[in-house]
């Protein structure tokens, strides 16, 4: 989703680090990294209200030994995420990578083969580093016609099948039908429905996790 370029740049720098300094135990914990756009960055709401922050609390409550890193940036595209990926992977070495990108590409009419190529390269690079990957899909309005709209939604399915990843077909599945679930821009969910976003992601994410994971035990073999 769109935002001020300067704010996006500053957010990109901040996104490589957690808000609070890590304890020694957290530093040893395997990382679960969310690489996303404003839908995961928590645009228009407090950081602690977003679905990624709620995920961190759920993991702690249920005994999963992961440290969540939100490397999401408002306004991000698949190309921007791909460009940032080497630093994200090099800094955090994730055991699990959640990829939530593409909405801004769709709103701008990016050619779908380019979207699929970017997503596939992100997934492949993460898998080469032995990360389990969850691809989170989106849907867009039919501004560019039904063929593009359908092809956009199917792009996530195609990449997931080709790269053998877990898939959430549509992040906003539980909230999209009700305009009251969105901020005044009609694009970004309000704070009170962020738990519904997490509940959409959780069933596909949970099988990738290891309860009480130790740093080595939490790294599944690379998927081919």
Predicted feature locations:
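Bacterial N-terminal signal peptides
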Residues: 8-18
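Residues at secondary-structure transition points
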Residues: 14, 23, 42, 48-50, ...
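Alpha-helical cap/lid subdomain in secreted, periplasmic
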Residues: 54, 64, 82-224
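Acidic-and-aromatic substrate-binding clefts and catalytic sites of carbohydrate-active enzymes
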Residues: 75-79
């Amino acid at each position: 989703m769109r935002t001020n370029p300067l704010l996006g740049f500053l957010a990109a720098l901040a996104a490589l680090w957690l808000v609070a300094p890590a304890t020694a135990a957290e530093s040893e914990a395997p990382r679960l990294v969310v690489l996303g756009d404003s839908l995961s960055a928590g645009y228009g709401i407090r950081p602690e209200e977003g679905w990624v922050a709620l995920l961190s609390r759920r993991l702690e409550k249920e005994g999963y030994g992961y440290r969540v890193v939100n490397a999401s940036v408002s306004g991000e595209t698949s190309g921007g995420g791909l460009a940032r990926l080497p630093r994200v992977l090099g800094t955090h070495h994730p055991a699990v990578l959640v990829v939530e990108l593409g909405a801004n590409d769709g709103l701008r009419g990016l050619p779908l083969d380019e979207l699929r190529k970017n997503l596939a390269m992100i997934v492949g690079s993460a898998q080469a580093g032995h990360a389990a990957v969850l691809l989170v899909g989106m849907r867009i309005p039919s501004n560019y016609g039904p063929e593009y709209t359908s092809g956009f939604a199917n792009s996530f399915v195609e990449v997931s099948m080709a790269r053998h990843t877990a898939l959430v077909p549509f992040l906003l599945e539980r909230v999209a039908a009700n305009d009251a679930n969105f901020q005044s821009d009609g694009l970004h969910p309000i704070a009170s429905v962020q738990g519904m976003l997490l509940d959409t992601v959780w069933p596909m994410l949970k099988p990738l996790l290891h309860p009480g994971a130790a740093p080595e035990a939490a790294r599944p073999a690379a998927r081919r």
